[in-house]
Amino acid sequence: MRGKTLISLLIAALLVAGCAKKQAQTGTPTTEKKWRVGVTLLTKQHPFYQELEAAMRETAEKEGIELLIQSAEFNLADQTAQVENFLTSGVDALIICPVDSAGIAGAVKKANAAKVPVFTADIAAQGGDVVCHVASDNVQGGRLAGEYLAKLLGGKGKVVIIDHPVVTSVQDRTRGFMEAISKYPDIQVVDRPPGDGVRDKAMAVTETMLQKHPDLAGIFAINDSTALGALKAVESMGRTNVVIVGYDGDPEARREILRGCALKADAVQFPRKIGSTVVEMVAKHLRGEPVPKLVPIPCDLIDKQKLEREPSP
């Protein structure tokens, strides 16, 4: 009996040694650490953020990251609570697309105190320590939009900006826009009402602007939800002489531009590039590699002629 026991123990020891040797040869650990990263998006309803999220998920899979994605749907209190819940759950890092650039600072500082690295995408945070911000070069995009609108107007006319000034990305867009049209002394920005980046509100605001400024010539819409709301107002009031330049390059806006309506052009962002890049930056940082504080993604501009030459898929 004792002999059989010794033989059994010897066999078990050999099996364990064999497994250890095999593991050493393959270099594959029995369990692989997967980083957990909390993500709070501005919204999941907008095509821009749908593309950004899809690219984040694809890149996270390659980088060995588990993404925990929630959406604030434009609600700062919800976004703050999401960050706090992520911190309580013990995530390795955070990616935030702020609802309000200044308002999110408190949540960022809580993450700093918990020593959880914070990254921002598309919209920057104003306050707290952020490891890396990845976003479109929105100043450049605003310049492209301003130059195009100035060309449409022949260098003169009254313009309104349907604004959303509580987020840094829009602040940058309007700054670039103003830089561009400042070269044209006969173009006058007569109003900058907030439309909150939402179609229905942008439509209502545009209707008010069209009534207030009967000689209005042009509109700069800070995103495509705004542009499409403005377009509906312009068409419903029969003011199709008013031209609109939007921002984002969403599929619906592209279709309207191709239709040949008052929406003439869009500054274009690349949300998939933003989404993939921010996850790559998180992975590098978690591996102990240096990352830049800012990664700007260049913008482009599309109009009917360009879309006809290079149709979107």
What are these language model-derived features?
Residues S8-A17:
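Bacterial N-terminal signal peptides
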Residues C19-P313:
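A residue-level marker of the well-folded mature domains of exported/periplasmic proteins
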Residues M1-I7:
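Bacterial N-terminal signal peptides that target proteins for export
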